[in-house]
Amino acid sequence: MLDVNNFEYMKIGLASPEKIRSWSYGEVKKPETINYRTLKPEKDGLFCERIFGPQKDWECHCGKYKRVRYKGVVCDRCGVEVTKAKVRRERMGHIELAAPVSHIWYFKGIPSRMGLVLDMSPRALEEVIYFAAYIVTDPGSTPLEKKQLLSEKEFRSYYDKYGNTFKAQMGAEAIRKLLQDIDLEKEVDALREELKSAQGQRRTRAIKRLEVMEAFRNSGNESSWMILDVLPVIPPEIRPMVQLDGGRFATSDLNDLYRRVINRNNRLKRLLDLGAPSIIVQNEKRMLQEAVDALIDNGRRGRPVTGPGNRPLKSLSHMLKGKQGRFRQNLLGKRVDYSGRSVIVVGPHLKMYQCGLPREMALELFKPFIMKELVSRGLAHNIKSAKRKIERVHPDVWDVLEDVIKEHPVLLNRAPTLHRLGIQAFEPTLVDGRAIRLHPLVCTAYNADFDGDQMAVHVPLGAEAQAEARILMLAAQNILNPKDGKPVVTPSQDMVLGNYYLTLERENAIGEGSYFKDTNEALIAYQTGYAHLHTRVAVQASSLNNKTFTEEQNNKLLLTTVGKLIFNEILPDSFPYINEPTQLNLEEKTPENYFVDPGTSIKEEIQSRELVKPFKKGFLGDIIAEVFKRFQITETSKMLDRMKDLGFSYSTKAGMTVGISDIVVLAEKQGILDEAQTKVDKVLKQFRRGLITEEERYDRVIAIWSEAKDVIQDKLMGSLSNRNPIFMMSDSGARGNASNFTQLAGMRGLMADPAGKIIEIPIKSSFREGLTVMEYFISTHGARKGLADTALKTADSGYLTRRLVDVAQDVIIREDDCGTDRGLTVSALEEGSEVIEPLIDRLIGRTSFENVKHPETGEVIVEKNELISEDQAKTIVESGIQEVIIRSAFTCNTKHGVCQKCYGRNLATGSDVEVGEAVGIIAAQSIGEPGTQLTMRTFHTGGVAGDDITQGLPRIQELFEARNPKGQAVITEIDGTVLEFKEVKDKQEIVVQGEVEQRSYAVPYNARMKVSIGDTVEAGQELTEGSVDPKELLQIKGVEGVQDYLLKEVQRVYRMQGVEIGDKHVEVMVRQMLRKIRVVSSGDTEVLPGSLLELHQFKEANHKVLMEEGEPATGRPVLLGITKASLETDSFLSAASFQETTRVLTDAAIKGKRDELLGLKENVIIGKLVPAGTGMPQYRNLESGLDMPESAEESSEEETQTV
């Protein structure tokens, strides 16, 4: 058996008739499948055992030879070889066709490859192949031209005139003759000559023809192989026929299609033997051609062949195409053994790295391990009895199971797996019941809740797989989110509420101003009712053993609350005592003002102070990030578990409830509504008098009601007591926000109709008061639209992720430094006056391109090629530096990937990225995963042209697909000043005066100007509001201008929705869109003008020519959308499994393409280890990870085996 890991590349080509015969084990001569009485395959039929091998292991057709001892014997009676039945999956047969037929992929594809080779139109080809016209194959001495089409009538008249002096034929035979006559060398030279002078359409056609001719010349494929003499028959197990319960048979559609071909072929043979009239033979040949077309690609030409119930039959091409095709269903989406799924329930008692596995599920999943252990413990004699024991659930089994699952991690996956945190590893603990228990903190990463979600469990079997699961995938390791490097395991809901309640302060609580010698004493006071959690007290600072306190502070008293004393117990010793939710307290030390000298009157001191705010969700996240930064993984996951327990415990003790009395009704509400109504009436009056337009009236009414709702909201929030449970839930970040509360207690406000337009009648009631029928009806629109949008958005976002993954899947960190001589200048991303992304966010975790010096002192803050840390980034920003040059994926020189230095820090681990990290996939997931959070709609604001800019998910798709944007902005191509605005006919023009020339740009009337007369503008700058067309920008500002623009725009959309994504992810994607060059002229190189080349291929071709002092090729960069870029990848396996399968394969076969298996998808398809992570060649043969001196090797044999 071939070892999959030793493949170098995979090549595809056209099969010659000899090749097809060499694959075959025999000719299929009859259309029969199996005998209906004996249910055995018919001889020479589509399932023949003599050709394809026996149906039962080691047993021939007639039963003369049975058992394995006759292995390899060919039965003298029935001719079947005695071997395993699985050869029926690999042995092929063939059909000798009585007349040549054309292969529909090469004749019918776009562009028609046969047409390009012969320089004929597809229409003419079709007429010849389907016997509607004759084609002159040899004009002889007649005035006819080669390849001239003749109708039946013309052929007759010429035949009468010239007799046998010329040859004209019909059908695929004629085409084959023409293909064989072609001299490729001569044609290629002629085409290259023609290219030098040709223009327009002729040039395009010549380029296309040259490409196909070159392909045939270089690949070793013969052009005549596009015509088939022999048809391969695929193995029978791949087109099976199975008996159903009622004695009927279910068969693959391919068998029907093959039967049609064989029937027509046999009939044609008979007609030829009988010497039938040519018209009958021609008709039969045409029918054979159509049958073969239907077999290869049913429905490509004419009406598809249908089966019972008018269903089109699935041909060979359909077996590969689409989601149900071979690629996506079986090669990229295999189902795996050792897996199970069940409903999840919360497991608050679990540790971060644990999950609860139901006993009966564990028993089934770990069956082989249990059997082995039962035998090795002597509890069963052999594997068979061990298996029986497990099936009967013998009590011994449970003890063994407990031991087997120790230290054996399992993987939990929740669909949809939107990013890599959708599969994590846990150590299983056995639980009763049939539900999987999940740790509450990992829910955010999985986006799971416990309303009936299900999860799948997978068992890593091999030692390497277990090691990877434990070291890389354990839930306790995945604390940071790969998209922005922020903690993903922040507490939510109950846990937030508990910790918020715990850290609240209250005036005049029981025992206020008490003084305790240590935490324990305070706890006893709380438990015995002498103090409350919210009581402000003093405690001896030295008793807290906090390593951040100074000597002086330790001698003082610390003012805090009982709750905060309890909260700080969960934090590590050398962490500041957290007394207030500020960055200063978190990052540096407990503020000095909380320490008082002994002897101060504590009660008076406390009463003179303001209450300190409690710790909300965001601050808890900051604490986690800070602990992670200082103490790394292990300590953080322990602290998280303690924080979770604390939260659950105190949210229970808090006993938060929501009652109707908690929803306070605003007294001034009616007044505010009346005032708004008056304003609306006034606007209506103005409209009726014709002072304002319909649009203005609508916009103003909407604005009035929105403002009224905001006023009510502000007053409501102001009137709420901060002890109100609903307020506490919303304020802490546990659930709900101000808008939800306004709907409960104030008013619901304005609603959108099904088209997304805002209805101008507001809902004045709140849920507390109850809605009128009319109001209820209006609000159903919005609710329904919400659900519909969510469903559509999920599908759209999923498809976006799929395309992103496809285009970036081969971007892997391949080396540590590419040695590039270019950097990327970064500054804060700004849109007008608003900052989209501050400079500090763009610097952290990036490598500097040159020394960064302090502008005043001149000292070096960051060395060249050094990773910029948080502190260094802070120093850079504080020193007033506005822009820094960093290494970036945009400027990286690594082939097929990025280098360590240009990528910088791996956001998911907080340390340098390692060689082998699949950063392309991480980037795609980081951009795709928040896609569901983006809005769907294009905002319509009453038809003002400039405002209808696409936002949210559609805008992201527009950017990554490099489409012409909606609401396109007009941009200037030259530097200069805005001279004037001219009015021409029905539009206006902006005139820009450059140094040398003057340009004018036509602008629609309703566009909104971004510049005024006298402004200085740069090339590529927008003159009107709207989105820039990136392709236009590429021509004006070049690659760097487009890269900057796309990065800024993608970040703008995400940041507007409050989603943070690391720049480097967007850079990786944009790099993939700009990796091709379109050749303009080929110079002395071999490359074809008009062809698309990878950047490095183009450079290599030029380098070669320059070394020989020839003329290099010229090219211009192109921006491809992600779908186009995926299909243009060098790997035909990856492209074929993405979209347009048949087109990609047709093209690859003609070119005889080699797939070098550099990306991840291609390797998954052929079943090889992916070339990323531990699958990279340089890591492949590391046994133990220990580099031992040679002398030590013998002595430590035992140790290596345990590693």
Curated annotation (Swiss-Prot):
Alphabetized UniProt keyword annotations: DNA-directed RNA polymerase, Magnesium, Metal-binding, Nucleotidyltransferase, Transcription, Transferase, Zinc
Co-factor remark: Binds 1 Mg(2+) ion per subunit.
MF terms in GO: DNA binding; DNA-directed RNA polymerase activity; magnesium ion binding; zinc ion binding
Residues that coordinate or bind Zn(2+) 2: C818, C892, C899, C902
GO CC terms: DNA-directed RNA polymerase complex
Binding site for Mg(2+): D449, D451, D453
Function: DNA-dependent RNA polymerase catalyzes the transcription of DNA into RNA using the four ribonucleoside triphosphates as substrates.
InterPro entries linked to this entry: DNA-dir_RpoC_beta_prime, DNA-dir_RpoC_beta_prime_bact, RNA_pol_asu, RNA_pol_N, RNA_pol_Rpb1_1, RNA_pol_Rpb1_3, RNA_pol_Rpb1_3_sf, RNA_pol_Rpb1_4
Catalytic activity: RNA(n) + a ribonucleoside 5'-triphosphate = RNA(n+1) + diphosphate
Cofactor requirements of the protein: Mg(2+); Zn(2+)
Protein family membership: Belongs to the RNA polymerase beta' chain family.
Organism encoding this protein: Oceanobacillus iheyensis (strain DSM 14371 / CIP 107618 / JCM 11309 / KCTC 3954 / HTE831)
Protein name (database record): DNA-directed RNA polymerase subunit beta'
Residues bound to Zn(2+) 1: C60, C62, C75, C78
GO biological process, one term: DNA-templated transcription
Enzyme Commission identifier(s): 2.7.7.6
Enzyme class of the recorded protein, top EC level: transferase
Domain of life: Bacteria
Pfam family of the protein (one): RNA_pol_Rpb1_2
Listed SMART domains: RPOLA_N
The organism's taxonomic lineage, starting at the top: Bacteria, Bacillati, Bacillota, Bacilli, Bacillales
Feature: compositional bias, Acidic residues: 1190-1203
Disordered, as annotated region: 1180-1203
Subunit structure: The RNAP catalytic core consists of 2 alpha, 1 beta, 1 beta' and 1 omega subunit. When a sigma factor is associated with the core the holoenzyme is formed, which can initiate transcription.
